[in-house]
């Protein structure tokens, strides 16, 4: 089977199901596991890659593309034609995060390809796990997918059982800084499962633009900074600069030294198998006395 993955989380699912050798095309962002970096790249971004962009610059550039009605991502149609994939894994959840499946089907029609396209669009932890089962059924690896999902569900249940015995802590999952956004889709449910009271966003809905005064008014006891697509070092650097804002510095979370930066790209932004690592990271950030401390390359306490 020839599989093309148009989002990093799908690439991780493919490898988790033992299908790495069947993966014939990926995106420029597919970097896990390491073998994914050796695969042909069928998706590139129009955003500059020659220098790091600030959160504000990224937001402004994305807004410009949206205003002009231009796609942020481009498909290498010639490469897809040569691959002739049997299965393409895509998404419709976020036009900013990856190629929309509509853009994919238009390209396939233009190319005359009859590839099956599966759109993975989870809004909850459970839907993320269901997506793994969907890929398993489509690729003939349903037993492996069922085994993997059963293990992931056991980990969810273990976190939930412990968290239910603990007080709920007001928690802000901050997904972007300039402008500030509170994490949406599956993130609010993760916060609740991990023993927090999710603040300023709504479960199963897109990330929500907020204001810094609203952050102060919400009085979060824990803040977890998980900027979409950022790895830990970049998230740390961005978060340290935010302490110059009085709204953040005056929150109970900042006063109580409960402000954290995380490796968002690996454990929160991608709805794949490693999202369970993200849940366990969140649980420790919210209730450090009751959950094992994660490895230091996953989360850092940031102090003003």
Write out the residue ranges for each language-model feature:
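N-terminal ligand-binding lobe of clamshell/alpha-beta domains
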Residues: 1-304
């Amino acid at each position: 089977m020839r599989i093309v993955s148009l989002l990093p989380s799908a690439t991780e699912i493919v490898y988790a199901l033992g299908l790495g050798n069947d993966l014939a095309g990926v995106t420029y962002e597919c970097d896990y596991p390491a073998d994914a970096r050796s695969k042909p790249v069928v998706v590139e971004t129009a955003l500059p890659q020659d220098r790091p962009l600030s959160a504000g610059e990224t937001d402004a550039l994305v807004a410009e593309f949206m205003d002009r009605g231009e796609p942020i991502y481009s498909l290498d149609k010639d490469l897809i034609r040569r691959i002739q994939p049997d299965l393409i894994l895509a998404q419709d959840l976020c036009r900013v995060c990856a190629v929309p499946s509509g853009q994919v089907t238009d390209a396939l029609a233009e190319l005359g390809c009859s590839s099956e396209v599966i759109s993975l669009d989870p809004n909850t932890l459970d839907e993320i796990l269901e997506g793994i089962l969907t890929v398993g059924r489509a690729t003939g690896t349903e037993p492996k997918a069922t085994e993997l999902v059963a293990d992931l569900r056991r980990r969810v249940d273990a976190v939930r059982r412990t968290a239910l015995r603990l007080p709920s802590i007001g928690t802000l999952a901050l997904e972007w800084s300039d402008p500030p956004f509170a994490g949406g889709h599956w993130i609010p449910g993760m916060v609740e499962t991990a023993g927090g009271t999710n603040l300023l966003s709504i479960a199963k809905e897109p990330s929500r633009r907020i204001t810094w005064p609203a952050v102060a008014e919400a009085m979060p006891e824990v803040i977890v900074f998980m900027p979409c697509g950022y790895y830990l070092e970049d998230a740390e650097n961005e978060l340290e600069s935010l302490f110059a804002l009085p709204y953040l510095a005056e929150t109970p979370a900042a006063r109580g030294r409960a402000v954290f930066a995380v490796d968002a790209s690996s454990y929160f932004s991608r709805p794949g198998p490693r999202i369970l690592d993200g849940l366990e990271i969140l649980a420790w950030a919210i209730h450090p006395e009751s959950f094992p401390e994660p490895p230091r390359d996953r989360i850092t306490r940031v102090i003003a």
